[in-house]
Amino acid sequence: MKDTFVEKVDDFVKQHDVLKEHSTIVVGVSGGPDSLALLYYLLEKRAAKQFEIVVAHVDHMFRGDESHEDLQFVQDLCKGLGVICETIRINVSQYQQQYGMNAQVAARECRYAFLERIMKKYDARYVALGHHGDDQVETILMRLVRGSTPKGYAGIAVKRPFHNGYLIRPLLGVTKEEIVDYCNKLKIIPRIDPSNKKEVYTRNRLRKYVLPHLKEENPQVHEKFQKFSMQMQEDEAYLQELAFEKMNKVITKKSDKQISLSIPAFESMSMPLQRRGIQLILNYLYEYKIPSSLSSIHIDKVIEFFKRTQPSGSLDFPGDLKIVRAYEECSFGFKQEIVSPFLQDLSVPGTITLSNGDKLVTEVSEDIPSDMNETVFVAKYNDISYPLRIRSRENGDRMSIQGMNGTKKIKAIFIEAKVPREKREEWPVVCDASGNVIWLPLLKRSAFAISKETAKKDKYMIIHYKSKESSGRIMK
């Protein structure tokens, strides 16, 4: 007769395509009943499935000698079982203080970094963790109570990408009670973490006071929550694809540290896609290392920020992320140091690279470019005094405007073009050797410029503005 626990896990693993044969699996083992049940299950399948098993254990050093004894327990167990064991002691409290995060997040980051390292070392395809069905119920309830993103409400994923393989949770189809029964049957005596009973933690209170009532209503409640989780994940994957597609049409500029979007185009999207669109931007900029202090409230703040009647403003997010609105455009980017005034000579022909990576390239030609757009400036060579100088703006700057009488303040040009204030200090101002402002790239040409219509055969000085920024596609 088949063991009920093993049979249920087998069915779950097969249903969700969790494991492939001939694989190396790193098993996270704390010494508690959940991870030990997972280890013994995989060992039972090792010969038939041709698995290679590596155990990984992290001592977070939260409980002094007691947590060190957990490490020794796992080492001794693996020695007796003939299983490779990799362990590490990490002062998580120190890491927590250094990076300003709560203890649970700090422990998770340290643990996952170690698991990734062991995965690389053994070229493993999977990292297996012992989360079970009751954990799934508690997680979903906790996120509903605290608030989360739609992806968060889906709970714990059965299988997700991790390093060059997958992080898997084969025990999500069984309950804690079934795990304890399996351990008792095999006469496994696990280590017990006393913090799992402390009611200071929300999860422990839900486990003690809420979960028993749910199980009274339906003993298989974990299966219902798991089904809910899978449906949420499937729906979320579809909506994420839609949001990704829409956002690539909304984004106007993108670099490694900054993304800009059109607010009217963004607001034309449905609200579910708006929320996911903001999440995509945050994932990209934070490189999927979202600060623990960031929550769904912040996404709602961005959406409310767009609805304000004021044409400009800013929001400060964790990790020095700043969101700046300027009229109908909004930029998400990390705070930069104050831009110092700059001055550079530009030879003709020649090239200079600006602080933002963009370039100004000059040439001399008897022919003018076929495309005379805002990235090109053309003047008669002999009308300009050399060398050209590229500098930051100065108080009182004015320039003559092509096709207009008199001069105009550069400040007024920036305001009319709705250039954000923080961008104005780094905007290049092109002057001749006499100090005349001859071009404000992308914005205005001076009276020194010639148009395509008035151009005749002559010797011309041409300046090209070349941006390094890619178009606005968000990397997946």
Swiss-Prot record:
PANTHER family: TRNA(ILE)-LYSIDINE SYNTHASE-RELATED (PTHR43033:SF1). One of its GO terms (biological process) is tRNA modification. One of its GO terms (molecular function) is tRNA(Ile)-lysidine synthase activity. It is an enzyme of class 6 (ligase). It is found in: Cytoplasm. Its EC number is 6.3.4.19. NCBIfam families: lysidine_TilS_C (TIGR02433), lysidine_TilS_N (TIGR02432). The keyword tRNA processing applies. ATP binds at residues 30-35. Its main location: cytoplasm. It comes from Bacillus cereus (strain ZK / E33L). Keywords: ATP-binding, Cytoplasm, Ligase, Nucleotide-binding, tRNA processing. Ligates lysine onto the cytidine present at position 34 of the AUA codon-specific tRNA(Ile) that contains the anticodon CAU, in an ATP-dependent manner. Cytidine is converted to lysidine, thus changing the amino acid specificity of the tRNA from methionine to isoleucine. The keyword ATP-binding applies. The gene is tilS. It catalyses: cytidine(34) in tRNA(Ile2) + L-lysine + ATP = lysidine(34) in tRNA(Ile2) + AMP + diphosphate + H(+). GO terms for cellular component: cytoplasm. InterPro entries: Lysidine-tRNA-synth_C (IPR012796), Rossmann-like_a/b/a_fold (IPR014729), TilS/TtcA_N (IPR011063), tRNA_Ile_lys_synt (IPR012094), tRNA_Ile_lys_synt_N (IPR012795), tRNA_Ile_lys_synt_subst-bd (IPR015262). Belongs to the tRNA(Ile)-lysidine synthase family. Signal peptide: none annotated. This is tRNA(Ile)-lysidine synthase. The N-terminal region contains the highly conserved SGGXDS motif, predicted to be a P-loop motif involved in ATP binding.
